[in-house]
């Protein structure tokens, strides 16, 4: 098994973003199922949550990731990432600049970027301090209402860059359209509803992991 966070990132195929499941009340059980099924990285994305509440939920994420040897990602906030000792900080285009985040977190925390256009993907593929990036949305998604979906053309462009830096396709990806994403050249994906809304999250994660690792 890969033994460092950077090794685990290189080996990662399935990146899950989920809310804190306050409505369902099953966060710990859900995370155990998804991580056991094959999710490699998990990120809490629950906009509007106060920092204290976010830290409380992230402790559940951190405990689950330790149990399963998987990576914990924090969205947007370097201070929160530092407080919970996360493995990963993910930054959008409008978030904290990468050098500032790196100054706060040091060299060991992995930093990812969101990209939504060819120029952004090209920059993220070479920018100093960036460890991985996400490219999309492949399809419109309710988790990002109003955001233009550049579609699979952006995935194809990113694949054509030939970068050794890990990158993930994102946006509306499910088991029904995964083959299209693979055909466009992606070998890693970010998943939300296809696992969070699955009747059997572990089985859904297993299927994603199997198909991505055999691609």
Curated annotation (Swiss-Prot):
Cofactor descriptive note: Binds 1 Mg(2+) ion per subunit.
Entry binding sites for 4-amino-2-methyl-5-(diphosphooxymethyl)pyrimidine: 43-47, 75, 114, 144
Annotated GO CC locations: cytoplasm
Required cofactor(s): Mg(2+)
The EC number(s) this enzyme carries: 2.5.1.3
Protein origin, superkingdom: Bacteria
Keywords, comma-separated and alphabetical: Magnesium, Metal-binding, Thiamine biosynthesis, Transferase
SUPFAM superfamilies (alphabetical): Thiamin phosphate synthase
Record Pfam families: TMP-TENI
Positions with a binding annotation for Mg(2+): 76, 95
GO MF annotation: an example: magnesium ion binding
Cross-referenced Gene3D superfamilies: Aldolase class I
Residue positions binding 2-[(2R,5Z)-2-carboxy-4-methylthiazol-5(2H)-ylidene]ethyl phosphate: 141-143, 172
Matches recorded under NCBIfam families: thiE
Function: Condenses 4-methyl-5-(beta-hydroxyethyl)thiazole monophosphate (THZ-P) and 2-methyl-4-amino-5-hydroxymethyl pyrimidine pyrophosphate (HMP-PP) to form thiamine monophosphate (TMP).
PANTHER family, sorted: THIAMINE-PHOSPHATE PYROPHOSPHORYLASE, THIAMINE-PHOSPHATE SYNTHASE
Family (UniProt): Belongs to the thiamine-phosphate synthase family.
Xref: HAMAP family: TMP_synthase
Protein name per Swiss-Prot or TrEMBL: Thiamine-phosphate synthase
């Amino acid at each position: 098994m890969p033994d460092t966070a950077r090794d685990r990132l290189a080996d990662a195929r399935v990146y899950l973003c989920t809310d804190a499941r306050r409505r369902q009340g099953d966060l710990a059980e859900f995370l155990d199922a998804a991580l056991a099924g094959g999710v490699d990285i998990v990120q809490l994305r629950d906009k509007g949550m106060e920092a204290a509440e976010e830290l409380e939920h992230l402790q559940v994420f951190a405990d689950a990731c330790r149990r399963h040897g998987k990576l914990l990602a924090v969205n947007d906030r370097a201070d929160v990432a530092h407080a919970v000792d996360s493995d990963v900080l993910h930054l959008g285009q409008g978030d904290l600049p990468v050098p500032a985040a790196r100054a706060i977190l040091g060299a060991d925390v992995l930093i990812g970027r969101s990209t939504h256009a060819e120029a952004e993907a090209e920059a993220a593929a070479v920018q100093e301090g960036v460890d991985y990036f996400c490219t999309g949305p492949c399809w419109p998604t309710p988790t990002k209402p109003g955001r233009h979906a550049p579609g699979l053309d952006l995935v194809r462009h990113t694949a054509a860059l030939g970068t050794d830096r890990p990158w993930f396709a994102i946006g509306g990806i499910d088991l029904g359209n995964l083959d299209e994403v693979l055909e466009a050249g992606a070998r890693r994906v970010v998943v939300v509803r296809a696992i969070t809304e699955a009747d059997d999250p572990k089985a859904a994660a297993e299927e994603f992991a199997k198909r991505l690792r055999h691609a």
